[in-house]
Amino acid sequence: MQVCVNFIQRRATELQPKVILINRLSAHLSTSPSPPLPHPLVTTSHTPVGALTPKPPNTSFGSHHQVSIAMPKFNINSPSFTPSVVDKAAIDSTGPAAPAAAPAFVPGKSPIDLEQIKNKLTISKDKKENAKSALPKLNPAVAGFTPGASASGSTTPKMATAPSFQPNQTSAINTNSNSSASATSQSGPPGASFQPNQSFQPGAASFQPRFQSGPSQIEPGYDNYYDEMSNGAVMAAAQNQQFPLQYHLYAPHYLSASRQRQLLSHQKTAKDFFLDPHLHQRLHKQSEDLLRVEGSSNLPRFVDKYHSLVLLDSNLNTKENGAPGESPQWVYKCMNGKDGKQYALRRIQGFVLTNEQAMTSVRKWQSIVHPAFVSLCEAFTTRDFGDASLCMIYDFLPSAETLFDLLNRGQQFSRDVIISYLLQLLSVLDTIHSAGLAAKTVDPTKILVCGPGRVRLNCCGLYDVINFDKDENVTLFQQQDLRNLGLLVLCLACNSVEATKNVEQSLTRLDSELQEIVQYLLSSNTSKTASRVLASLTPLLTATFNESLNTNDSLEHELRRELENGRLVRLMAKLNFITERPGPDPEMSQQWSETGDRYLIKLFRDYVFHQQDEMGKPVMDLGHVVRTLNKLDAGIDERITLISRNGQNCLIVSFKDLKQCIESALRDLE
């Protein structure tokens, strides 16, 4: 009950000023001969919001000021509160209100007669029209509030000069006489600038913003394909944009022929995680040969622009080919001081150049390019070895061996391998003979095996420089190249370099097809050429070509497996960028890596690399490191428990949250 009494007294106190105001107005109107003022309770039209008349200074009732203001009353039925316009002349004729005439307000006694007050405040039609004309009217054709419209700082818009408002259009206001020229110069192709004044259409499929002509702000040289789009085509292109795959996404092998057996998606073998062991071993051996250096030797430090010489010959006291009357030859690995690449330097010991024109033949051989050909780079004479020597520079093929060495070790060659070697050598001979040259080096000591099923013809151009002064017939040497190729096939088929001593007996060990090929190559028919022999071996070419394609697919598969092998390195680099480093803020530099998300990253670092077993010994499990970092890179929802080193803090967090913490910390550092 006491609460109700307090509430009634409080409400009476709040209403007392309003009742006093109404009583004073009633007393004022009863003594004034002028018509009553307009009141919002009885007016039939409402002044628009925002069109307010400046309010005169407030004066307290009972003062002797000549102007009295009629306070409007709040009407809940009106859409907005609008102050009424007071006729100053009507108030001046009556003078200020007499506060003594107002009856005293007694709460709870006499009720207020609202109908009587409403009748007294009834406005005449003429006075209402005058009051309405004194207010500014809202014109729909006039733009709204325009800041800075006048130089004086007034925020009132200039109604007379304001441009008319037109929906979905943009009006250009000319500030000077040159504005038209400026507007013309800014016109451009559609789609250059965005026009936000597009009306919303309910039920439309999608919102497509309009584009307005304007200059394209693009850096010079940038290929902006948006220039060809218009009317929302840019938004359509953005919706169809495809983003690149994440680094942790691996695509499975798409060739079913390469699978040894059918496995389920979750079943893996050891070969699925590692490089092919044979390819791995071969590549490592090549790297060792490239990086091998000579500890101590009597070789010169520099030979022309080449340095770091390493002897590659296995037999130092014998000539390489064993032919009588020829100068000894030595082969070195060297490095070019200009381009930093490895080359093979073939030295002809004791050679004296008698004709400078002999070096011109090197240019012809430099133009020969073939996958079964060891390119000749340059030739020069030198005395850096202590004598007159001819140096021939060829491409260096690491881990390459000659057929002569392989045959001496008892290497067996299958029929398919022999046919593959035959086709490769016929192809390179066809290229050489078409250039008007002869190889003169189709010999087991000059043919290199540089990979599975790959051979290369080496030392080409060597005898053109040595025997330059001799009158030689190129056609005869081309026929000799084909005959030597037949003898080479015979040696490979018999697995011995001694097979050429008794050709007739060695041919009996070959099958009919190979026997026919060798007999044709060894024949004295001068019309035979490398291209004709290749044409006759077209049926054999299919199998070799298919094998080369399968090898290419296998190498591409191995390359794809190693495509993103640097993901974990990048991830570990990010972790070390964040942990135990000062922060970007000088005030929080010491605590930056120990607070917030960075503390989780530090605990995760200990979880990956600093684990211990139950005996307190360090655990160095590479599988745990790789598995955990892969999960972090993928950002999966799996949760792990992170425990501080003192064991007082224990946090459960997912790999997804940890990945977000790392990205957030890196953004702070940037």
UniProtKB/Swiss-Prot annotation:
It is found in: Cytoplasm. Residues 539-577 form a coiled coil. Residues 123-224 are annotated as: Disordered. Residues 149-167 have a biased composition (Polar residues). It comes from Yarrowia lipolytica (strain CLIB 122 / E 150) (Yeast). Residues 578-670 are annotated as: Knob domain. GO terms for cellular component: P-body; PAN complex. Its main location: cytoplasm. This is PAN2-PAN3 deadenylation complex subunit PAN3. Residues 168-193 have a biased composition (Low complexity). Regulatory subunit of the poly(A)-nuclease (PAN) deadenylation complex, one of two cytoplasmic mRNA deadenylases involved in mRNA turnover. PAN specifically shortens poly(A) tails of RNA and the activity is stimulated by poly(A)-binding protein PAB1. PAN deadenylation is followed by rapid degradation of the shortened mRNA tails by the CCR4-NOT complex. Deadenylated mRNAs are then degraded by two alternative mechanisms, namely exosome-mediated 3'-5' exonucleolytic degradation, or deadenylation-dependent mRNA decaping and subsequent 5'-3' exonucleolytic degradation by XRN1. The lineage of its organism: Eukaryota, Fungi, Dikarya, Ascomycota, Saccharomycotina. GO terms for molecular function: ATP binding; poly(A) binding; protein kinase activity. Residues 292-538 are annotated as: Pseudokinase domain. GO terms for biological process: mRNA processing; nuclear-transcribed mRNA poly(A) tail shortening. PANTHER family: DEADENYLATION COMPLEX SUBUNIT PAN3 (PTHR12272), PAN2-PAN3 DEADENYLATION COMPLEX SUBUNIT PAN3 (PTHR12272:SF11).
